[in-house]
Amino acid sequence: MDKDSQGLLDSSLMASGTASRSEDEESLAGQKRASSQALGTIPKRRSSSRFIKRKKFDDELVESSLAKSSTRVKGAGGVESGRCSGSEPSSSEKKKVSKAPSTPVPPSPAPTPGLTKRVKKSKQPLQVTKDLGRWKPADDLLLINAVLQTNDLTSVHLGVKFSCRFTLREVQERWYALLYDPVISKLACQAMRQLHPEAIAAIQSKALFSKAEEQLLSKVGSSSQPTLETFQDLLHTHPDAFYLARTAKALQAHWQLMKQYYLLEDQTVQPLPKGDQVLNFSDAEDLIDDSKLKDMRDEVLEHELTVADRRQKREIRQLEQELHKWQVLVDSITGMGSPDFDNQTLAVLRGRMVRYLMRSREITLGRATKDNQIDVDLSLEGPAWKISRKQGVIKLKNNGDFFIANEGRRPIYIDGRPVLCGSKWRLSNNSVVEIASLRFVFLINQDLIALIRAEAAKITPQ
């Protein structure tokens, strides 16, 4: 009886112990859930901060970058999607999490390394090709030679004339890119190697003078008259100091420039007086009083100018009225007066020596021979060996217009216009006819031609 009662007591104690343990575990699990809900995140597994370097393959690189970017994206509830897909934490991890402080820590947004790598890779080609269009190979060669000569980028910016107007910052950036950027320096070297040797020689001739070169040139006296041989001897004496592309002529030109600016050793610059103030153009322009520049009206002067203008116009009018009277006197002395046309003369071809009268409606021009008789023998005026036997024909039409037709080899010039063989041209009063260096003036009897036109007008309606 005692044994049975003792066994029942033991079994009841064990059952109560197991029940109490299950209740303790449930209460502990409830506390853990409450703490995790208060934090808003599932506790992370503690891992070592030591990084183990391991070679990654291409597929791993792509998948890891995608996995990292996906694990950084959080849902609206604040739970990471990568963590939700994993396995549940063990009991030992739960115990460690329960000991952690309950204060929530706000997560700090950190950029993903995969995205930053892609941004850097996309920016690099833009920086490489940024200045490839503006900086020519000739500019790079000029920049390199000038920096090697002066070792001063400010002097290079002021003294070198590039193909574009670069700022000092752009010159500095280009020089640093040529030094430290392997991509840009490689492209620039390839472009410079493709330059023509003549272009390279022209660029090298524009290299700036170094301080050592100018110091040697300054020793040549300003009072002396150095020749090209003097500078050639200077080149042979100091071959290491001068640039390889220097010539005696280039040294002479630079020496003359230094002499002009008083940079030689035996030249002294006169100091300015201390009391005097040097004004530039803008300062002098500001000192000018604009009110004094206005023209002051002088009534007496204006009256005199008006009277003089009226007097000159009266004299000009009188001379114009007397012009035809003086023309008659001049023509009577020189014998070049206008001819007196008779009733039978239609026109006159007047030369320097002879006058040819046109009394028929059609006349021929040329050079007369024994076998060829023509109306107007041009050999009477001057040398006519270049004129054809039958050079041309002048005709009068019913409407009163004169036309000349060229039938010779050489052209006939009417007022400077050539009339070729087989062509014709209208002659007007005072037209200049030039045939093989012989010049004539064609004069028309206007009165007789007017009568002919009137008769033609009467006949036309009938």
Curated annotation (Swiss-Prot):
Gene name of this polypeptide: Mcrs1
Motif (Nuclear localization signal) on chain: 113-123
Name recorded for this polypeptide: Microspherule protein 1
Gene Ontology cellular-component annotations: cytoplasm; dendrite; histone acetyltransferase complex; Ino80 complex; MLL1 complex; NSL complex; nuclear body; nucleolus
Residues modified to Phosphothreonine: T103
PANTHER family: MICROSPHERULE PROTEIN 1
Post-translational modification: Ubiquitinated by UBR5 when not assembled in the INO80 complex, leading to its degradation: UBR5 recognizes and binds a degron that is not accessible when MCRS1 is part of the INO80 complex.
Record localization: Nucleus; Nucleus, Nucleolus; Cytoplasm; Cytoplasm, Cytoskeleton, Microtubule organizing center, Centrosome
Domain FHA: start-end pairs: 363-419
Gene3D superfamilies: 2.60.200.20
Example of a GO MF term: G-quadruplex RNA binding
Function: Modulates the transcription repressor activity of DAXX by recruiting it to the nucleolus. As part of the NSL complex it may be involved in acetylation of nucleosomal histone H4 on several lysine residues. Putative regulatory component of the chromatin remodeling INO80 complex which is involved in transcriptional regulation, DNA replication and probably DNA repair. May also be an inhibitor of TERT telomerase activity. Binds to G-quadruplex structures in mRNA. Binds to RNA homomer poly(G) and poly(U).
Domain characteristics, as noted in the entry: The N-terminal region is required for nuclear localization while the C-terminal region encompassing the FHA domain is required for centrosomal localization.
Residue ranges annotated as motif UBR5-degron: 389-396
Residue numbers carrying Phosphoserine: S22, S102, S108, S282
Quaternary assembly: Component of the chromatin remodeling INO80 complex; specifically part of a complex module associated with the N-terminus of INO80. Component of some MLL1/MLL complex, at least composed of the core components KMT2A/MLL1, ASH2L, HCFC1, WDR5 and RBBP5, as well as the facultative components BACC1, CHD8, E2F6, HSP70, INO80C, KANSL1, LAS1L, MAX, MCRS1, MGA, KAT8/MOF, PELP1, PHF20, PRP31, RING2, RUVB1/TIP49A, RUVB2/TIP49B, SENP3, TAF1, TAF4, TAF6, TAF7, TAF9 and TEX10. Component of the NSL complex at least composed of MOF/KAT8, KANSL1, KANSL2, KANSL3, MCRS1, PHF20, OGT1/OGT, WDR5 and HCFC1.
Residues recorded with modification N-acetylmethionine: M1
Regions of compositional bias (Basic residues) in chain numbering: 43-55
Main location: nucleus
BP terms from Gene Ontology: chromatin remodeling; DNA recombination; DNA repair; positive regulation of DNA repair; positive regulation of DNA-templated transcription; positive regulation of protein localization to nucleolus; positive regulation of telomere maintenance in response to DNA damage; regulation of cell cycle
Disruption phenotype: Embryos exhibit normal morphology at the blastocyst stage but do not survive to the gastrulation stage. Apoptosis and global H4 acetylation are normal and the trophoblast and primitive endoderm are properly specified but the epiblast lineage exhibits a severe reduction in cell number with mutants failing to form a typical inner cell mass colony.
Keywords recorded for this protein, A-Z: Acetylation, Centromere, Chromatin regulator, Chromosome, Coiled coil, Cytoplasm, Cytoskeleton, DNA damage, DNA recombination, DNA repair, Kinetochore, Lysosome, Nucleus, Phosphoprotein, Transcription, Transcription regulation, Ubl conjugation
Compositionally skewed regions (Pro residues) per UniProt: 103-112
Coiled-coil ranges per UniProt: 301-335
Source organism of the structure: Mus musculus (Mouse)
Region spans: Disordered: 1-130
Regions that span the bilayer: none
